[in-house]
Each structure stands twice: as C-alpha cells, then as structure tokens.
Amino acid sequence: MSDPRYQVDVSVVTRFLADQSQPEQNRFAFAYTITVQNNGSLPAKLLSRHWVITDGDGHVEEVRGAGVVGQQPLIAAGKSHTYSSGTVMTTRVGNMQGSYQMLAEDGKQFDAVIAPFRLAVPGALH
C-alpha cells in the first residue's frame, strides 16, 4: 500500500493540432493538457519529468528534463497544477507515458506515475 502522504494523481486531455500538422510530410502535431493533483497530505514540488513516447511504428523516444514548461511548481496538499504542452510524431497514432519526480515537504522523493495515454489523428482508429 502506498503512503497517503505522497499521493499525486495525473490526468491528461489530448488533441490533434491539424493546423500545425503536415500529413504529406508525416508530421502530426498533438497538444496535451495535464493536471497534476496532489492528493497527499504534504506539499510536493515537481522536480523533473520522464516521458516515454512511442509512435505507431513502435519507435520509442525517451525525454527527461527539469520541471514542466520551465517551471518546478510546488503543489500544496489538496491542490493541483495544470499545464499544456505538445509533441510532434511521424505517425497518425502513438502513445505517451512516464513519471514526474516529486519532492515532498519532508524531504522524501517519490515518483508520480503518468499512465499511458493515446495520441491519435481523428478517424485514425476504428
């Protein structure tokens, strides 16, 4: 059982960016809005991110970096942080998953898991 002091949940909403995509050049742009909800009992700072991006051909790219969109937000207990970002893929369908490395107010580091989510051009999946 996980410690309730360190409970961070992540939700994702995605959308295809047709105006920034060039299908004839295998360039498909997607935006995603992520909400990081601190359901633990301690404030926690989002230190870094780790993404695993898999395209429709099975090619995998890993991305690691500090914070999110240039920030390392401190999220109070019971509060959330929402941000938007994006990615470009060479296939019409793919998925992303990963984790955020968090630092609780008491000094404990822990991971907040980002469950796999799909990126897809509308109509690409039946």
UniProtKB/Swiss-Prot annotation:
Gene3D superfamilies attached here?
ApaG domain
Taking the record's annotation, the residue ranges forming a coiled coil are none
InterPro entries from the UniProt entry: ApaG_domain (IPR007474), ApaG_sf (IPR036767), Uncharacterised_ApaG (IPR023065)
User: One GO biological process from the UniProt record?
Assistant: error-free translesion synthesis
Q: Which Pfam families match?
A: DUF525
| Boundaries of every ApaG domain copy | 2-126
NCBIfam families of this UniProt entry?
PRK05461.1 (NF003967)
Its name, as the record gives it, is Protein ApaG
Q: Which gene encodes it?
A: apaG
